[in-house]
């Protein structure tokens, strides 16, 4: 077996409890309770959604051109809000802008692709360029079928929420290894 990927690919996941220092996560998280700053977000104990937002922004700042996301290790509320939740709790009362609303914008504006492994949320079929099903551990291309099925369940949410722009690539300084 062989595996090939872009050298700039980054695995993105929720990491409850991780620390975050001075990250601009406004692209995904805004208007936190008690006026907590998301332009210079810092915490010693991030939630699943704020940690995944920080991981995503850090990957972008490091120059990643490919985000690798597994639904199983993601914060559900970071990835998507279903239409019933959007109807009951208005978007302006919810601090999280779900990844599904930003994934196309990331590609359009920053040329950042996403590979998402999902098994329970078909809403991503609406924004996918390609859908591959694993059938008995073998990949099977099913984009046409997935897009056709998705038409029966139209997304009612607006995908790109506002005009917050991502920051330019930030220089990441790595510690030097000692001999």
Residue positions per predicted region:
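Short, flexible loop segments at the rims of nucleotide/cofactor-binding pockets, characterized by
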Residues: 43-47, 90-93, 110-111
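Phosphate-binding glycine-rich loops and their immediate beta-loop-alpha structural context
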Residues: 1-62, 66, 73-75
